[in-house]
Regions:
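Extracellular glycan-targeting catalytic surfaces
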Residues: 1, 115-117, 140, 147
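Beta-strand-rich recognition/accessory modules
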Residues: 59-127
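Secondary-structure transition/turn motif
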Residues: 1-7, 103-106
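Polysaccharide-binding surfaces and accessory modules of carbohydrate-active proteins
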Residues: 3-74
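Residues at beta-strand starts and edge strands
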Residues: 1, 11-13, 109-113
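Short loop/turn segments at connectors of secondary-structure elements within structured domains
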Residues: 9-11, 109, 127, 142
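Contiguous beta-strand segments within globular domains
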Residues: 128-146
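Short secondary-structure subsegments characteristic of cysteine-rich extracellular domains
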Residues: 19-21, 144-147
Length: 147
């Protein structure tokens, strides 16, 4: 940042990393000493921090482990600066994704947010191809072709 945030922006400006929910429904998460399950339906208490109702964060902490029990989906996000917030963004602005958020502190111009994202890597793993068909549809006599 060229200069610290103006006072009216403090607590509002941050960085969001979004996580596609469909891959994580029913999977667990750990954020420091807190644990939970990624819900299929957005629920939870509401807060009104800046004049608009939002769901409260699912948890706040420094180190998030997403899907610790699933080798193909596990990843770790660790903040070297401030706290991480885990949000269910499906209730906020009809976002549709889970959100990991870090808020930019008031007094920083360099290294305002520093995260380390570590995927779990499975050696020699190869993605299985998915065969698709046209979503536009086919004519009555038109042969169906794999694309």
């Amino acid at each position: 940042l060229e200069k610290p945030l103006p006072a009216e922006w403090v607590g509002k400006v941050g960085f969001n990393m979004e996580i596609f929910p469909g891959e994580f429904f029913g999977k667990s998460w750990l954020l420091d000493e807190q644990a939970g399950i990624f819900p299929q339906q957005p629920n939870g208490p509401l807060v009104n921090p800046h004049g608009e109702f939002l769901t409260a964060p699912l948890a706040t902490g420094k180190k998030l482990i997403v899907a610790p029990d699933a080798d193909k989906q596990r990843m770790t996000i660790e903040s070297k600066t401030g706290a991480l917030e885990l949000w269910d963004g499906r209730a906020n602005h009809n976002n549709g994704w889970y959100i990991v958020r870090g808020v930019v502190p008031a007094d920083k111009t360099t290294a305002a947010l520093e995260w380390v994202v570590t995927p779990h890597v499975i050696k020699n793993w190869v993605y299985e191809p998915v065969i698709q068909v046209s979503q536009l549809g086919y004519g009555a006599q038109q042969p169906k072709k794999v694309v």
